[in-house]
Curated annotation (Swiss-Prot):
It is an enzyme of class 6 (ligase). One of its GO terms (biological process) is prolyl-tRNA aminoacylation. This is Proline--tRNA ligase. One of its GO terms (cellular component) is cytosol. The gene is proS. Belongs to the class-II aminoacyl-tRNA synthetase family. ProS type 1 subfamily. Its EC number is 6.1.1.15. Keywords: Aminoacyl-tRNA synthetase, ATP-binding, Cytoplasm, Ligase, Nucleotide-binding, Protein biosynthesis. It catalyses: tRNA(Pro) + L-proline + ATP = L-prolyl-tRNA(Pro) + AMP + diphosphate. It is found in: Cytoplasm. The keyword Acetylation does not apply. PANTHER family: MITOCHONDRIAL RIBOSOME PROTEIN L39/PROLYL-TRNA LIGASE FAMILY MEMBER, PROLINE--TRNA LIGASE.
C-alpha cells in the first residue's frame, strides 16, 4: 500500500482556530487542515477530509449492501412539478434552494429525494412480486439554512446517504425499518460513535413513526429526554413524562374576575399583591396552524413545544400569532388571554391540566384575570380537547417506569421514517397485490449525514492537543516520523513504512525537515491513531517508539515486529 509523504502532501495546519469557530469539531477540522470555508455554510473538503469521508461512505455502503440495498445516483436538480405532486413544493418554504431555467421553468436543488425515488418506483414497479426493494444513494444535498454555523454541523451543502424501502404492506415496512435500524447501529458503532436511538418528530417528512440516532454532546442543537432505568429515550419534540400531582382545593362555583392592571406576564402574576404561583396559572398562547388560529393551553411554568402542537393540529406549519392578530380573535392583548368558555377557535389543552381546579388565567379583557378556574368544567366542557403540548423537563417522571428523566443536548446523525403511503398515494405509485388489486406502495425513508458522522466523531474524540480519531475513519492508520536528520534514521523509517504498507496499514510518512517536537504536535493535531517514531537511541537497540493517540504510553517495539503489531491494531479496531 502506497504511503503519503508529508513533505509532498497538502496539509495546511494552523496554530489558531478561526475566531468564529465555537465547537470543537469546527476548530479542529480547520486547524488540522481538513476543511476551509468558501462561504456561509459552504466548505471545501481538503485531502485529509476526503480520505476520512470516503471511509465513512465505505462503511455506509457495506452495511446498506448487507441488507439488500442497491445503490443509485439521482439528480440533485429537480423540476418543481414532481415536488408539487407530493404537496411539498410549498411546505419547504425558504429552506429550499429554488431557481428558474432560461425558459422560466421552476426547479430546486434537492434537500432530500423522496419524490424522485417515488417517481422511479411509480414508473418501474408493477407487481408485489417485485417487492420489497431497498434503494439508496450517497449524494450531495442542499438546504438554505437561515443560520449556518458550527462548521460541518449546520451547512447549506452536505452529503447524505438517503435510502428508501418499498413494500406491499405495513408488515413489510416494519421489517424494512428494523433492517435499517440494525444497519444504522452497525454503521455508527464501526465509526466509533457512542449513540442513542430516540423517538422523534417526523416533521415535513410525514409518516407514522420515526427514530433519530443521536450523539450526546454539548455541540448538539436537539434535546433528548432519557430514562437511565428503562432506557426510554425521545427527542423532546415527542417525549412525554409523568408530572407530580398538585393538591388543588375545591375551587369556586364559577370563575371570578379580578383586576390585574399592568400584569401581562406569568412572572408578574407571581408577585404581590396577587402571588399566584406559576404552577397554578394557565398559560394561553395563540398560534396559527396553516394560517388558521389555534389556542394552546399549558401550565404557567411549562413551555409549549411547537413540534407537538404541529403534530396535534396535523398542520404543515405552525407559528406564533403576530401581536396584531390576537385582539380581533381574543378580545384582548397577549398577557390577558384565557380559554375559559372560548369557542371562536380550536382550543388544545395539555393533559397534565385535565383535572386541575382553582387555576388562574387571563379574562380576555386587558387588565383582568380569572381565578377559580376548573379546567374540565370551564374549558374542556366547551369544546376544547386534550393534546400533548408541553416540553418535558429533567427530573420529571419517566412515562414507562418509576425512574426520572435526564434531559441533555444531542446531535442528530441519522433519522429513519415509516412514511407509509404518504408519497405513493399523492404520486400514484401503486402495484398489483396478490389478489390482483392496485394498492399504494408502502414506503420508508432513511437518512445519514456523512459529514455529521465525521464532525460527531471529533466532538466525542478529541483532547487539548487535537483530534483522537477512531481507527475506522482516520485519514491514516499510522504516522511514521524520524527524530533526527541522520540518513540511517531515514533509511530505517523507509523500511518501516514499506513493511507497514505490505501489511495493509495506511501510512502518513512525516519526512519533513522539522524538529521532533513539531512533528509530534502535528501528529497529535491530526489525530492519527498510531505514531511510530524512529530515533537514534532506540534504533541502536533495534527498536522504534510506538504510541497510540488515544492515551497510550510510549513503548519500544522491535523494528521487525512493528508492522505486524500495527496491522493487528488496525484489524482489531475496524
Amino acid at each position: 500500500m502506497h504511503a503519503v509523504r508529508y513533505s509532498q502532501a497538502f496539509i495546511p495546519t494552523l496554530k489558531e482556530a478561526p475566531a468564529d469557530a465555537q465547537v470543537a469539531s469546527h476548530k479542529l477540522l480547520v486547524r488540522a487542515g481538513f476543511i476551509r470555508q468558501l462561504g456561509a455554510g459552504i466548505y471545501d473538503y481538503l485531502p485529509l477530509a476526503k480520505r476520512s469521508l470516503a471511509k465513512v461512505e465505505a462503511i455506509v455502503r457495506e452495511e446498506m449492501d448487507a441488507i439488500g440495498g442497491q445503490e443509485f445516483y439521482l439528480p440533485a436538480l429537480h423540476p418543481a412539478e414532481i415536488w408539487k405532486e407530493s404537496g411539498r413544493w410549498d411546505v419547504m418554504g425558504d429552506n429550499m434552494f429554488r431557481l428558474k431555467d432560461r425558459k422560466g421553468g421552476d426547479y430546486c436543488l434537492g434537500m432530500t429525494h423522496e419524490e424522485i425515488f417515488t417517481a422511479v418506483a411509480r414508473d418501474e414497479l408493477r407487481s408485489y412480486r417485485q417487492l420489497p426493494q431497498v434503494w439508496y444513494q450517497i449524494q450531495t444535498k442542499f438546504r438554505d439554512e437561515p443560520r449556518p454555523k458550527s462548521g460541518l454541523l449546520r451547512v447549506r451543502q452536505f452529503t447524505m446517504k438517503d435510502a428508501y424501502s418499498f413494500d406491499v404492506d405495513r408488515a413489510g415496512l416494519d421489517r424494512s425499518y428494523e433492517d435499517q435500524r440494525r444497519a444504522y447501529e452497525k454503521i455508527f458503532t464501526r465509526c466509533g460513535l457512542d449513540f442513542v436511538a430516540v423517538q422523534a418528530h417526523s416533521g415535513s417528512m410525514g409518516g407514522s413513526e420515526s427514530s433519530e440516532f443521536m450523539v450526546r454532546t454539548e455541540a448538539g442543537e436537539d434535546l433528548v429526554a432519557a430514562c437511565p432505568r428503562c432506557r426510554y429515550a425521545a427527542n423532546t419534540e415527542t417525549a412525554t413524562s409523568r408530572v407530580a400531582a398538585e393538591a388543588d382545593g375545591p375551587g369556586l362555583g364559577a370563575p371570578e374576575k379580578f383586576a390585574t392592571p399592568g400584569v401581562v406576564t406569568i412572572e408578574a402574576l407571581e408577585q404581590a399583591p396577587h402571588s399566584v404561583p406559576a404552577r397554578r396559572q394557565l398559560k394561553t398562547l395563540v398560534y396559527m396552524a396553516d394560517e388558521k388560529p389555534v389556542i394552546a393551553v399549558v401550565r404557567g411554568d411549562q413551555e409549549l413545544n411547537e413540534a407537538k402542537l404541529q403534530t396535534a393540529t396535523g398542520a404543515v406549519a405552525v407559528r406564533p400569532a403576530h401581536p396584531e392578530e390576537i385582539p380581533p380573535l381574543m378580545g384582548a392583548r397577549a398577557g390577558s388571554l384565557g380559554a375559559v368558555r372560548f369557542t371562536r377557535a380550536r382550543v388544545l389543552v395539555d393533559p397534565s391540566l385535565a383535572d386541575r381546579k382553582d387555576m388562574v388565567t387571563g379574562a380576555n379583557e386587558d387588565g383582568f384575570h380569572l381565578r377559580g378556574v376548573d379546567v374540565r368544567r370551564d374549558v374542556l366542557a366547551h369544546g376544547a380537547t386534550l393534546a400533548e403540548l408541553r416540553t418535558v423537563k429533567a427530573g420529571e417522571g419517566c412515562p414507562r417506569c418509576d425512574g426520572t428523566l435526564d434531559v441533555f443536548k444531542a446531535l442528530e446523525i441519522g433519522h429513519i421514517f415509516k412514511l407509509g403511503t404518504k408519497y405513493s398515494e399523492s404520486m400514484k405509485a401503486t402495484v398489483l397485490d396478490a389478489e390482483g388489486k392496485q394498492v399504494p406502495i408502502v414506503m420508508g425513508s432513511y437518512g445519514i449525514g456523512v459529514e455529521r458522522i465525521l464532525a460527531a466523531a471529533i466532538e466525542l474524540h478529541h483532547d487539548d492537543n487535537g483530534i483522537v480519531f477512531p481507527m475506522a475513519i482516520a485519514p491514516f492508520h499510522a504516522t511514521v516520523l524520524t527524530l533526527g536528520p541522520e540518513p540511517e534514521l531515514r533509511k530505517a523509517a523507509e523500511e518501516v513504512v514499506a513493511a507497514l504498507g505490505k501489511e495493509g496499514v495506511e501510512v502518513l510518512f512525516d519526512d519533513r525537515d522539522e524538529r521532533a517536537g513539531v512533528k509530534f504536535k502535528d501528529a497529535d493535531l491530526l489525530g492519527i491513531p498510531i505514531r511510530i517514531a524512529v530515533g537514534k537511541k532506540g534504533l541502536a537497540a533495534g527498536n522504534v517508539e510506538w504510541k497510540l493517540r488515544k492515551g497510550g504510553a510510549v513503548e519500544l517495539v522491535p523494528v521487525g515486529e512493528v508492522a505486524r503489531k500495527a496491522a493487528e491494531a488496525v484489524r482489531a479496531a475496524t
